[in-house]
């Protein structure tokens, strides 16, 4: 879906909602975009909203993330993708707190390997140590495009996988942004149900009570890596 992150709902770009919800975590949010001219508009958005950003390679997203983390002096990285405008920063904060409490730089924590949350809430937490290793050793195009496969496919004996799961399996719900149907659903959720300010549990409740909403994009098959 071209230009999807700047599509409008309720008078604002979806990227604005995404950033606002990420800020619930209490941690800095950095936009890692590309050097392509087509992404100048993303940079303009960041500058208008005073958001830190980094521009890197379009295809090798792994190198872009590594160089971004290096540029900003990060020791821990939370990776999210821009197609999740209703992501929940509170869930991310809880995951970061647990990660920091564990105090092990070899942990890769994610809520998307064992899927119990709706698609569209995906996040990964890992150290600069692991990101640096992946950047040095990843060789497959898929590992470079999707950033973390080298880590979670356990190509490194150093990685400890930590699955973040929900008590209830809500993986049947889809609130990601890949297709026009996804956009239609997200727009309705934001404009008619105030989803932009709701926690995940309340959004799930709306979808449960309104199966006609879930049906809008239920037929979409997610692309495989």
Identify what each model region corresponds to.
Residues 29, 44, 87-173, 184, ...:
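Conserved core of the sugar-phosphate nucleotidyltransferase
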Residues 8, 55, 79, 110-111, ...:
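Structural signal for conserved beta-strand scaffold positions within catalytic alpha/beta enzyme cores
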Residues 25, 73, 104-105:
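Short loop/turn motifs at secondary-structure junctions
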Residues 1-33, 38:
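N-terminal glycine-rich phosphate-binding loop and ensuing alpha1 helix
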Residues 196:
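Polar, enzyme-active/binding microenvironments
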Residues 23, 47, 155:
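Anion (oxyanion) recognition and catalysis
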């Amino acid at each position: 879906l071209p230009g999807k992150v700047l599509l409008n709902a309720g008078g604002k770009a979806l990227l604005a909602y995404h950033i606002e919800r990420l800020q619930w975590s209490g941690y800095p949010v950095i936009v890692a975009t590309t050097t392509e001219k087509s992404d100048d508009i993303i940079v303009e958005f960041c500058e208008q909203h005073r958001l830190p950003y980094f521009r890197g390679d379009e295809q090798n997203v792994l190198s872009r993330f590594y160089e971004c983390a290096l540029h900003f002096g990060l020791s821990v990285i939370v990776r999210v993708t821009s197609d999740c405008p209703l992501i929940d920063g509170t869930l991310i904060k809880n995951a970061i707190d647990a990660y920091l409490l564990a105090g092990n730089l070899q942990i890769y924590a994610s809520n998307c390997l064992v899927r119990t949350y709706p698609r569209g809430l995906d996040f990964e937490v890992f150290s600069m140590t692991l990101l640096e290793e992946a950047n040095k050793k990843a060789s497959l195009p898929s590992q470079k495009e999707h950033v973390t496969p080298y880590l979670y496919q356990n190509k490194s004996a150093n990685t400890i996988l930590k699955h973040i799961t929900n008590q209830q399996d809500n993986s049947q719900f889809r609130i990601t942004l890949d297709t026009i149907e996804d956009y239609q659903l997200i727009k309705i959720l934001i404009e008619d149900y105030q989803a932009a300010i709701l926690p995940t549990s309340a959004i799930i409740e709306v979808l449960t009570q309104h199966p006609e909403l879930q049906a809008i994009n239920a037929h979409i098959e997610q692309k495989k890596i």
